[in-house]
Each structure stands twice: as structure tokens, then as C-alpha cells.
Amino acid sequence: MNYFKLFNLPQKFELDVNNLTSQYYNLQKKFHPDSYQDKNIYTKKYLEKSMLLNQGYQTLKNMLTRAEHLLFLNNYKVDKKKKIVFNAKFLEMQIELFERLEIHKNKNNKHEINKILLEVSQIEKNYIKKLKNFCNLEKWKIAHSILYKLLFLTKFIKKTKKIQHEIIN
């Protein structure tokens, strides 16, 4: 299923999320079960359409799942469970980040953990720019590789924020 077509939106990485939301609500008005007084009229077909709209909306409103969907539409599957081998430079960065995080977690050093979080957030922003650029250029193989790096960074940021929260509390 092409969610861009479902919402009558251009098939590209950059998306007007307000327009997506507007399209979503307009379509949901037509297909949502609460719109039908007589539940006998509401069919399985409408329920499936409503669920499809929900799934499409959730996919397109998040830039990473939107990129994943774009890649899928261009024959690049993203398997989040698959272990990916990155280039040596990115692998070294991963190891260094985990080591630093572990050291400062054990020391309850919230200042250094904040520094790590800011640093990784900046790296993430740079990769988002790259992803946007390569999607716009339709360089799907490179975009695919960048998306995997972004998935790692997103997970690392989430883990770091959790540790940060634990230290504060």
C-alpha cells in the first residue's frame, strides 16, 4: 500500500505534516465507526479503511517511518531486527559512545551524559539532513544506509535519555 497515494500527497521525504493531518481527519470522518448512527451500515470494509488510514497516518507523520516507507516503495526493505555492519568509522563512533555513556552512568555524571546527548543529537540532525538530501535525489541505496544509522542514533538517544532520567530521579 502506498500511503502517499492514500492521502493524495506527493511521494517524497519532505512532507507538510499539517496537510497530512488535515487529509487524515477528512478521510477519517468518512470511514470512522463513530460516524455511523446505524452500526449495521458500518461494514468490515469501512473498518479496514479506517485502520489503514490510522496506519498510514502514523507512518507518514514520523520522518523515519516515512523514509522507511519511501524506501519500501523503491524496493529497499528495512529490517530493524537485522544486525547491520556499518563502516569502520561509524562502528568506532558507536563503541566510543557506548563506552562513554557507561563510564558516566556508573559515575552518575549527569553533566557528561548531557554532553553526550547533545553531541549525538547534533550527529542525528546531520544524518537527517543527509537522509533528506539523498531521498530528494532518489539515491535509495545511500538513503537506506543512512536510515539504519539514524535508527541506531535514535535508539541510543532514547537509551541516554532514560539513563539521564534515572540519574536525576
From Swiss-Prot:
Keyword hit for Chaperone: yes
Pfam family, one: HSCB_C
Superkingdom per UniProt: Bacteria
GO MF terms held by the record: ATPase activator activity; protein-folding chaperone binding
Disulfide bonds: none
The UniProt record lists the keyword Chaperone: yes
Keywords: Chaperone
Function: Co-chaperone involved in the maturation of iron-sulfur cluster-containing proteins. Seems to help targeting proteins to be folded toward HscA.
Subunit (UniProt): Interacts with HscA and stimulates its ATPase activity. Interacts with IscU.
Family from the record: Belongs to the HscB family.
Name of this protein: Co-chaperone protein HscB
The organism of origin for this protein: Buchnera aphidicola subsp. Baizongia pistaciae (strain Bp)
Name of the gene encoding the protein in the UniProt record: hscB
